[in-house]
């Protein structure tokens, strides 16, 4: 860990949009501390822990997650990931790598949005079959894009691998057999989890696999799956 002053990552006490950020901070051996906010129980789901300070943190666009690094105060999860990644040359080097990074960064967010909408929908059980029906087609696109590369930008690890690992893992928890038809995606997951810093983090007390979503969600809202 760096001896410099720690970054502060603020987010709900869930996995959510902060998981890839936490993974990247751990992988890069960045000194950081977390400010975790707790959402209240049903039926009100009181968010006052966050709302009471939301406009007092000098954030340009107050939201969660946020990252504070000295005078730099950043919101938007992908902006946070890029900020950390730039410090470690993990945004792609060649033009081809940068294009692949940009594509997969946005594709992952589209994919994530679909799962989030399903998980928070009051019609979750009604909509779930359609999601599962379309899931193999979605995953096939990721599989074809990855091809024979080790990582999604090519042969060099970039921040989008952290994003992609997270959303593939969420879908794997949602439907445990969903990656079985895609050996290269399964190999990617194993390769990522075998990275020394990632493997150590997964085994640590700081890591939590669940809950993925907040308490008002219909799925992924419990400490265990």
UniProtKB/Swiss-Prot annotation:
The gene is GSTM3. Glutathione binds at residues 11-12, 50-54, 63-64, 76-77. This is Glutathione S-transferase Mu 3. It catalyses: RX + glutathione = an S-substituted glutathione + a halide anion + H(+). GO terms for cellular component: cytoplasm; intercellular bridge. The lineage of its organism: Eukaryota, Metazoa, Chordata, Craniata, Vertebrata. Homodimer. Residues 5-92 form the GST N-terminal domain. Belongs to the GST superfamily. Mu family. Coiled coil: none annotated. Its EC number is 2.5.1.18.
């Amino acid at each position: 860990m760096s001896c410099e002053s720690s970054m502060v990552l603020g987010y709900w006490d869930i996995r959510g949009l902060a998981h890839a950020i936490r993974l990247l901070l751990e992988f890069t051996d960045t000194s950081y501390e977390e400010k975790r906010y707790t959402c209240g129980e049903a039926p009100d789901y009181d968010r006052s822990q966050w709302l009471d300070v939301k406009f007092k943190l000098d954030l340009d666009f107050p939201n969660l997650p946020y990252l504070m690094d000295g005078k730099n105060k950043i919101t938007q999860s992908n902006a946070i990931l890029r900020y950390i990644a730039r410090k470690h040359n993990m945004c792609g080097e060649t033009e081809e790598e940068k294009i692949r990074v940009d594509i997969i960064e946005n594709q992952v967010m589209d994919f994530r949005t679909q799962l989030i909408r399903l998980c928070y929908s009051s019609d979750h059980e009604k909509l779930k079959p359609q999601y599962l029906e379309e899931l193999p087609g979605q995953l096939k696109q990721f599989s074809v894009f990855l091809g024979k590369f080790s990582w999604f930008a090519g042969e060099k690890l970039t921040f989008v691998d952290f994003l992609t690992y997270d959303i593939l893992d969420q879908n794997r928890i949602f439907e445990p057999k969903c990656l079985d038809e895609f050996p290269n995606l399964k190999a990617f997951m194993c390769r990522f989890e075998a990275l020394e810093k990632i493997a150590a983090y997964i085994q640590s007390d700081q890591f939590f696999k669940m809950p993925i979503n907040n308490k008002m969600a219909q799925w992924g809202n419990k400490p265990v799956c």
